[in-house]
Amino acid sequence: MTDTMPTPRTPASAWREMVRGNARFVAGEPSHPRQDVERRESLGTGQAPHAALFGCSDSRLAAEIIFDKGLGDLFVVRNAGQVISDSVIGSLEYAVAVLQVPLIVVLGHDECGAVRAAIDSQQPDATPLPPHIATLIAPIIPAVTRVADEHDGHADAQEVGREHLRDTVAELLESSELISDAVAAGSLAIVGANYRLVEGTAVPDVVLGAV
């Protein structure tokens, strides 16, 4: 029988469930909730996800596994490097305005290939990237530049990743009046977190709203 946990409807309760699920995953004791036939049937006519998650496309960043969630629990948007675009903003606005999620998690991670590509692209002897990849990673370059300027030209990948995560959250707020208004009204929170591949932990770095 499917787990019938009530859908979290406040930012704090939604984040609390994300933290609990991640703790189960880290401990190696996932409950794999809401993944049975009954759950599939109940979702046939609609969805009421607990949260939206915008993360990197990296194959090691499987959101429902990391947070021990089930079918219909998360509205997930992903691209390489978790880079803001019109399609990302539109998808997240849909989650907030139509699905009424109380929480957006922006999830970066260590050892990110997009971050590494952005760093390497700034080297004097860098091989030009294919045009679509170059366009994709362009929003990461400001974080590379800032970190390099602060560390005598050396851009540490983990620090660049953290800076880019903060940039992503800031750009989301600046680009979407709908989302920024929801945060200001208290109906939505945004948590920017970094996922540690080996440990399995999702560590908050940026928190906007009451969680």
What are these regions (language model features)?
Residues 58-60, 109-114:
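Gly/Ser/Thr-rich loops at beta-strand to alpha-helix junctions
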Residues 50-52, 101-104:
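Short active-site oxyanion
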Residues 54-56, 78, 105-109, 191-196:
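Short beta-strand segments
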Residues 50, 54-91:
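Active-site cofactor/substrate anionic-group-binding motifs, chiefly glycine-
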Residues 2-45, 72, 81-100, 113-211:
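Divalent-metal-activated hydrolytic enzyme cores
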